[in-house]
Amino acid sequence: MSGYVLFSRGATAAAAAARASRVLRVFTERRRTLHTSLQSCSFAKELFLGHIQQKGVFPFPEVSQEELSEINQFVGPLEKFFNEEVDSRKIDQEGKIPADTLAKLKSLGLFGIQVPEEYGGLGLSNTMYARLGEIISMDASITVTLAAHQAIGLKGIILVGNEEQKAKYLPKLSSGEHIAAFCLTEPASGSDAASIQTRATLSEDKKYFVLNGSKVWITNGGLANIFTVFAKTEVVDSDGSIKDKMTAFIVERDFGGITNGKPEDKLGIRGSNTCEVHFENTRVPVENVLGEVGGGFKVAMNILNSGRFSMGSAVAGMLKKLIEQTAEYACTRKQFNRNLSEFGLIQEKFALMAQKAYVMESMAYLTSGMLDQPGFPDCSIEAAMVKVFSSEAAWQCVSEALQILGGSGYMKDYPYERMLRDARILLIFEGTNEILRLFIALTGLQHAGRILTSRIKELKSGNVTTVMETIGRKLRDSLGRTVDLGLSSNIAVVHPSLGDSANKLEENVHYFGRTVETLLLRFGKTIVEEQLVLKRVANILINLYGMTAVLSRASRSIRIGLKNHDHEILLANMFCVEAYFQNLFSLSQLDKYAPENLDEQIKKVSQQILEKRAYICAHPLDRAS
């Protein structure tokens, strides 16, 4: 099938198809490097030290005019396909994506968006991948199917596969002839990936591994030809002892011994294929080890960390469509002889949805822009923050939209209840938001701990100079010192109309850095067990990154004269003010003796409930005698 034959109905469609085909040729003629290794320091990690690293963040990343023109030409036919060819209601009701729809997705090249051109893919940058994700998000089941295939299913081959593995597997995966799945989760191991029980045993002749075990909730599990599978293997440690360590494998269905259960009947994303996958004496050649034997945990984390940023642009695309649909309803629906749009509580909901969409979009494209830079930084924390913020905002905004729509939002005749069902999974997959908050906080604290080790040792030992310096800092802070981290005082970095918000960001970052030092001094290594503390640290950091993203983006929009940049100023300032006060409250909660800190009460209440495994308060109608 020709790549764009689906658009060839009539002269206009034919012209669109021709334009899109030219774009595709340009894409495949130009080589784009897909970065696969981490190099320079993360922007987010520096926030833990009270620093704002401007490089790569200010000004907001831009794509070239040529790239922008190309991607915009590609966007048109893709939007046309999703608007006219994809029946999301049917996909949801029937619980599967029709074969002809899958075929058209393949013909569009959507199964190889980030596969390098030399292996038959489009080789698009992270930013272009994010832009296409906005459109693909028009259908959640398709979004999940494509993401499971390339963001995690085949991503390991791109990141750590050797040349032979890439040449063998990527061409058919990029064309969609083969579909990929990522097999990590097991019945007894969800977030605790290291506890998997699937085992791969090396054969006596050392030519292959024998794979046995079961994986659950595998997206594309019933469709896939190629699986990235994680299993325990015996590894000889440096001291000569034998230990079980996780190893990643490329497994073909044709290797045999692979079966899958029936598709799961799910709450949302019902058209995606999710099922159990079982491996029974599956013989995997040693050449199909992905990365190093025993290095599977690192491979899994690199795969998951690399793609999370795209959830921000995908959810933003969904929310923009949702705002458009609900705004039309609010402006035409009358109650009390007035349009719904005239009521303050309805207006508040639209402001919230617009703000959330703007922030997540800014965070996603800031992250993709950093990833696309030469010598790009480690953006694993940033990508995780985008995922947490956008998934929670999606759930909140769709819920608010249903509130605007009233009964209509609850009916299956309209798409809104489906959007609510589809949104719920976002908080769970690609790492639950609880686990990601721990990852965000602990990764940054580990970085700060390495930098501050000597200072913390001096404070613990009572070094007079260090102690007096710390007391002096706290005294200056208590007197309301002016914080200048190079944003609010430099109009070349942040536009003056955003100056007050920039100052709020600087102040938050400064005191966050101080608080991090205090937490490391107070808890030391035991901080890994302080999940309520870590949650607050992560929440502050997510807000700081969101503030940074909107200030950088809005400043760029003002300077280059983008339309409606005054609207961006409103959204950016509104978010920064709200985030600033949220951060102040969270910072106060991190003080063990502050009245805002209810950690001990929270732990005691939950302990009493879980001991009885029940709600233990007496019924309000009960009597003591």
UniProtKB/Swiss-Prot annotation:
- State the Gene Ontology terms under molecular function: acyl-CoA dehydrogenase activity; flavin adenine dinucleotide binding; long-chain fatty acyl-CoA dehydrogenase activity; medium-chain fatty acyl-CoA dehydrogenase activity
Key word Nucleus present: no
Per the record, the GO terms for biological process are:
carboxylic acid catabolic process; long-chain fatty acid metabolic process; medium-chain fatty acid metabolic process; mitochondrial respiratory chain complex I assembly
As for subcellular location, the record says: Mitochondrion inner membrane
Q: Which residues carry this modification: N6-succinyllysine?
A: K96, K525
Q: Where are the transmembrane segments?
A: none
Phosphothreonine sites (modified residues) = T482
Q: Which cofactor does it need?
A: FAD
Q: Which reaction does it catalyse?
A: eicosanoyl-CoA + oxidized [electron-transfer flavoprotein] + H(+) = (2E)-eicosenoyl-CoA + reduced [electron-transfer flavoprotein]; octadecanoyl-CoA + oxidized [electron-transfer flavoprotein] + H(+) = (2E)-octadecenoyl-CoA + reduced [electron-transfer flavoprotein]; oxidized [electron-transfer flavoprotein] + hexadecanoyl-CoA + H(+) = (2E)-hexadecenoyl-CoA + reduced [electron-transfer flavoprotein]; decanoyl-CoA + oxidized [electron-transfer flavoprotein] + H(+) = (2E)-decenoyl-CoA + reduced [electron-transfer flavoprotein]
Q: Which residues of this protein are catalytic?
A: E430 (proton acceptor)
Q: Which Gene3D superfamilies match?
A: Acyl-CoA dehydrogenase/oxidase, N-terminal domain, Butyryl-CoA Dehydrogenase, subunit A, domain 2, Butyryl-CoA Dehydrogenase, subunit A, domain 3
Query: Transit peptide where, by residue?
Result: 1-41
- CDD domains for the chain: VLCAD
Q: Which UniProt keywords apply?
A: Acetylation, FAD, Flavoprotein, Membrane, Mitochondrion, Mitochondrion inner membrane, Oxidoreductase, Phosphoprotein, Transit peptide
Superkingdom, natural source: Eukaryota
Subunit-structure text: Homodimer. Interacts with NDUFAF1 and ECSIT. Part of the mitochondrial complex I assembly/MCIA complex that comprises at least the core subunits TMEM126B, NDUFAF1, ECSIT and ACAD9 and complement subunits such as COA1 and TMEM186. Interacts with TMEM70 and TMEM242.
Report the protein's function.
As part of the MCIA complex, primarily participates in the assembly of the mitochondrial complex I and therefore plays a role in oxidative phosphorylation. This moonlighting protein also has a dehydrogenase activity toward a broad range of substrates with greater specificity for long-chain unsaturated acyl-CoAs. However, in vivo, it does not seem to play a primary role in fatty acid oxidation. In addition, the function in complex I assembly is independent of the dehydrogenase activity of the protein.
Family, according to the entry, reads as follows: Belongs to the acyl-CoA dehydrogenase family.
Q: What is this protein called?
A: Complex I assembly factor ACAD9, mitochondrial
Recorded source organism is: Rattus norvegicus (Rat)
